[in-house]
Amino acid sequence: LSVMKKNMPEIREYLKIKADYLGYQNGLPWFELYAPVVEDDEEYSFEKGSQFVIDQFNTFSKHLGDFATHAIKNHWADVYPRENKVGGAFCENIRSLKQSRFLFNYGNHFSDVITVAHDFGHGFHVRCLGDQTILNTHYPMPIGETASNFCETIVGKGALKSATPTQKIVILENTLSNAIQVICD
């Protein structure tokens, strides 16, 4: 909490700048909190996006990259939106099989690539718990979100290395929006 409190002035400054950019003089309305400031014009097919995630994971840990590769090759992910499919994304862990299943509503944007990294982070976290007893595998949300947010950071930092100026704005805005979501939750 101390790190969040310490960085709140920067978050507030970002929100003031965003409000001004979007034309609001009296602060940013809640409904504009996650409004994009630039369009994400880069297309990331699931194949391209998931391979990018794997490549970035491998720069940190071959085990992490292998986990993501295994999940994709074994069709552990329900990737695309379709009629009557629930929205959002999540990771469901199947303890008895020592496996995870992933639900995405992948839309070919950078934010979808980050969502894949995030949820693979949840799955990898559970994989690392391995043969722990059930009592050791229940944890509070801040611990549960640590691995997933860390995986987002790995992929985001990797993406910045080769991004165009517009893509850099998309990546940084996505990072800030995710940080704001954590703070608001």
Predicted regions and their residues:
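Contiguous, non-catalytic segments that form substrate-binding/exosite surfaces or channel walls
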Residues: 1-101
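Active-site-adjacent bridging/hinge elements
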Residues: 27-28, 89-99, 119-130, 165-166
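Conserved helix-loop functional segments at active or binding sites
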Residues: 59-66, 92, 122, 126-133, ...
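Acidic/His metal-coordination segments adjacent to aromatic residues that form catalytic metal sites
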Residues: 96-104, 129-139, 169-171
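Active-site recognition of the HExxH zinc-binding catalytic motif
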Residues: 107-127, 148
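An active-site-proximal "capping" alpha-helix that borders the catalytic cofactor pocket
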Residues: 120, 143-156
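Active-site metal-coordination segments of metallo-dependent hydrolases
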Residues: 135-147, 178-182
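Long, amphipathic alpha-helical stalk/connector segments used for oligomerization, subunit docking
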Residues: 157-185
